[in-house]
Amino acid sequence: MTGNPISVNGKSYAWPQAPLVVVCVDGSEPAYMDEAVAAGRMPWLAGVREKGTDRIADCVVPSFTNPNNISIVTGTPPSVHGISGNFFYDPTTGEEVMMNDPKLMRCDTLLAKFADAGAKVVVITAKDKLRRQLGNKLDGVCFSSEKADEATLKENGIEGVVEMVGMPVPLVYSAELSEFIFAAGVKIMERDRPDIMYLSTTDYIQHKHAPGSPVANDFYAMMDGYWAQLDALGCTVALTADHGMNAKHDPETGEVNVVYLQDLIDGWIGAGKARVILPITDPYVVHHGALGSYATVYLADETERATVTEKLSGLTGVREVLSNAEACDQFELPPERVGDLVVTGERHMTLGSSADKHDLSGLTEPLRSHGGPTEQRVPLIVNRAAPGLASDTPLRNFSIFDVALNFAEVPEQARGAAE
């Protein structure tokens, strides 16, 4: 262990003075914590808001899981790390590709770099889809609760996870998938005292339940209890989210609010002349039906761009239509992994491809989803004061390691607990 600052992707990060636990609460619109605290369900967080750092940050757009988790662990926007969504279209091969492969990443993670310098690093995700990218080049522990029973020393740096935690492997579509992460995190912190731990949950609850609802408050109360345990173990606990979440349905009928872009564009310029890609698409579509508030459009004929842009811009529920250059400049995206046009939806509107391509039968509650700038505001909270961090400093969710390592003040007793 060096104890010296580490330079990663052009930025210097101080060595952790106490065990650092960074938590990405998937889909955590700020109102979830606000409502749970107001209801008295998060006493630990209520105390942290008094003594620690409590800010609002902007996530990456598209406000989806993969680009934001990779931004958080690299400290960079997608223009640097290359992950532009959960899913993208490669025009050179004509294939639509899940963005789960570490080969698609263009820079190293803080996690791998700290481990290379001697830090003990642990990564636990809910869904296995993220594990390989978060663990890219990482010499440490990295496993998912989804496949915790399959973890091996060779592949994951740990074995016997289920026995250690004392919980069965949860269903993918459950609150317990996220709880398993925290239960495992506490056990590992007690046993091994890693220097850095990254915990990334699933947004199953947020997709189904609004802020302040009984189920949502129960979920946040559960997390609050585990965070309190990590705090009591002397950890610096830093919280953020990959994106927010909004209702995307008619409040009267519960019907999904959606504009099917592929159907419309085909009607305007003819079938086969455009391809609509929805970067929210991932292997776990039951809770969102692959409907979010961000889409990208590839055009076979560049001369159609003005027509398609004008028509899309006039649609009710469409927030903005940007060219590739405009979108990549505004959202800091890699141009070659974005279409000719980027379309974002209004707060309560989703964007689909063709109506017959979306199976909404799994939506047991009115749709809540994300993807656009209207889901960009997320919490950034640390259980330490950061007096050197100016109150007007604009923050991103991928500022969380910077704030926690370079600005948060660790008390002497916590430093002692880290030894």
Region annotations inferred by a language model:
Residues 1-53:
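Active-site-proximal N-terminal segment of extracellular/periplasmic enzymes that hydrolyze or transfer
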Residues 18, 25, 55, 63-64, ...:
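Secreted, luminal/periplasmic, and some membrane-associated catalytic domains
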Residues 22-24, 196-200, 238, 342, ...:
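Structural motif
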Residues 34-75, 122:
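Short, structured active-site-proximal loop/turn typified by the sulfatase FGly-forming signature C/S-X-P-X-R
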Residues 73-210, 216, 287, 293, ...:
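His/Asp/Glu-rich, glycine-adjacent segments
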Residues 180-181, 221-223:
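Active-site glycine-rich loop that binds ribose-phosphate moieties when present
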Residues 344-409:
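Low-complexity, glycine/alanine/valine/leucine- and proline-rich hydrophobic stretches
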